[in-house]
Amino acid sequence: MTPAVFLVILCFGVASGAPARDPNLDAEWQDWKTKYAKSYSPVEEELKRAVWEENLKMIQLHNKENGLGKNGFTMEMNAFADTTGEEFRKSLSDILIPAAVTNPSAQKQVSIGLPNFKDWRKEGYVTPVRNQGKCGSCWAFAAVGAIEGQMFSKTGNLTPLSVQNLLDCSKSEGNNGCRWGTAHQAFNYVLKNKGLEAEATYPYEGKDGPCRYHSENASANITGFVNLPPNELYLWVAVASIGPVSAAIDASHDSFRFYSGGVYHEPNCSSYVVNHAVLVVGYGFEGNETDGNNYWLIKNSWGEEWGINGFMKIAKDRNNHCGIASQASFPDIF
């Protein structure tokens, strides 16, 4: 197995604001606050309202251009709408990693035996979308999702596993709770610990705590894990044949945080910098196969109200778009 370079990921939740106000938007503002249970001090209200309006204008412009055929995806207001782009990006780390090297001829050759579509949700491998909240626990959600899928493959039972167990107990492997971590370090913890609890016995709190693992409650274990080389070809083969795979991407753009549908392609996305962990649960294409509108199907951890019920279609076979293949891994269970 060729080792890949694996780097710490800083994940992110929700942040704070800036200024402006259009009285015609008062009702929409109140509805948005109610929907996302937002409340502010009088001073903060003015700042948040201004940021919210700026984000609304940006999203409306994007969707108008999308209607004219300029973009391939839509955006919408969501829980991040009172947050500036700068605030959002401050929660991320800028870590350089080697670019993925793609060999088109090899990819075409290997792809002959692979299905055109894969969606592990339809085969029972994927648990419902959860919400990490303000804790930077994306890495733990991505790791847990991959283990859940492999446990289902082995046992036929799909059990939501404990993200909190990883947050509290995998610091010895280099993870740092709500601050940062990687899926492969989480896998290493489970391997050494010889077990991971279920969500039912070790529920998510969204904050760091002392390790409270009880071996008698272990619901999953792994026998090893694989770090994939940073190349979409390897990711393609793994997702087609193994199951859901943990990955990391550049999620620092406004277009990502407000994504709502379509195949996401952000021209400014980096293939060298990753800052948010996700679970790749499938792939496919929109339109005709020859259109080249291929996508990876990823599961996020921002709740079902983000994206396509918590999922995203992100461009596939586009030079490792957003670094999707740069830090991919999956557990072994024999």
Swiss-Prot record:
Propeptide intervals in chain numbering: 18-113
SUPFAM superfamilies hit by this protein: Cysteine proteinases
Subcellular location: Lysosome
GO cellular component: extracellular space; lysosome; perinuclear region of cytoplasm
Example of a GO MF term: cysteine-type endopeptidase activity
CDD domains for this protein: Peptidase_C1A
Tissue: Expressed specifically in placenta.
Residues spanning the signal sequence: 1-17
Enzyme Commission number, as recorded: 3.4.22.-
GO biological process: proteolysis involved in protein catabolic process
Stored InterPro entries: Papain-like_cys_pep_sf, Pept_asp_AS, Pept_cys_AS, Pept_his_AS, Peptidase_C1A, Peptidase_C1A_C, Peptidase_C1A_papain-like, Prot_inhib_I29
Glycosylation sites: 217, 221, 268, 288
Active site: 138, 276, 300
Family membership noted in the UniProt record: Belongs to the peptidase C1 family.
Protein name (Swiss-Prot/TrEMBL): Cathepsin J
